[in-house]
């Protein structure tokens, strides 16, 4: 049984940057709180917890004088509230997410109705919507504009950074089809993360060459779920968070296994999965 890892695997640039910032802050201050989980990966959060990093869900729960913003970012009103309380804010927002926030603000300042292709309940999308002044729509439904009464003829479209490119392209086409009858002016900002795009491409290429694909990452991670959906289109694919979730029944008749990971999956977890697969192969 041969195991091959995709070329883009492990932490993405944004996650690695956020973790480095948080580790440094925790070491300097003897611990730090984060407003929301830094990333959607429990193994990483457990390790950070051991370094004195504590996750709080609400601003009211902050007990210290320093708080870190997660890599998913927040809206301007949240930032203003934190600063009004005299808190030191450590911003670990991913630069690609920042770019999406800037695009949303630019649309808003120009008087455009902002349409975000993304999960309305995801913290990244909530933050981006905040930079659009709350005047917009976040949806994955290509017919979403139909349900918006009196939508502006000026429309700005952008995407949650971790979405699948073909999905965003299809979404944009549908927005144009719906809006043209309103004599609309449409602006489109490509806010997809380049790292995630390359990761998806590499995973899809590998999935086409193996009998089984394993996606390692958090079950609640958006970019990890997108990798699962993509790989499923060409290969038998399973999502696991740790080696303990791997079922030996999946491996019957399998000669080649491909591995990819979500952007917040650490190298230790990936190595443990590879080692476990190696032990199974040696025992056959």
From Swiss-Prot:
Pathway: Isoprenoid biosynthesis; dimethylallyl diphosphate biosynthesis; dimethylallyl diphosphate from (2E)-4-hydroxy-3-methylbutenyl diphosphate: step 1/1; Isoprenoid biosynthesis; isopentenyl diphosphate biosynthesis via DXP pathway; isopentenyl diphosphate from 1-deoxy-D-xylulose 5-phosphate: step 6/6
GO molecular function: 4 iron, 4 sulfur cluster binding; 4-hydroxy-3-methylbut-2-enyl diphosphate reductase activity; metal ion binding
Co-factor remark: Binds 1 [4Fe-4S] cluster per subunit.
One GO BP annotation of this record: terpenoid biosynthetic process
Pfam families: LYTB
List of residues binding (2E)-4-hydroxy-3-methylbut-2-enyl diphosphate: 40, 72, 122, 161, 221, 223, 264
Its EC number(s): 1.17.7.4
InterPro entries listed in its UniProt record: LytB/IspH
Domain of life: Bacteria
Purpose: Catalyzes the conversion of 1-hydroxy-2-methyl-2-(E)-butenyl 4-diphosphate (HMBPP) into a mixture of isopentenyl diphosphate (IPP) and dimethylallyl diphosphate (DMAPP). Acts in the terminal step of the DOXP/MEP pathway for isoprenoid precursor biosynthesis.
Protein name from the UniProt record: 4-hydroxy-3-methylbut-2-enyl diphosphate reductase
Taxonomic source organism: Dehalococcoides mccartyi (strain ATCC BAA-2266 / KCTC 15142 / 195)
Record lineage: Bacteria, Bacillati, Chloroflexota, Dehalococcoidia, Dehalococcoidales
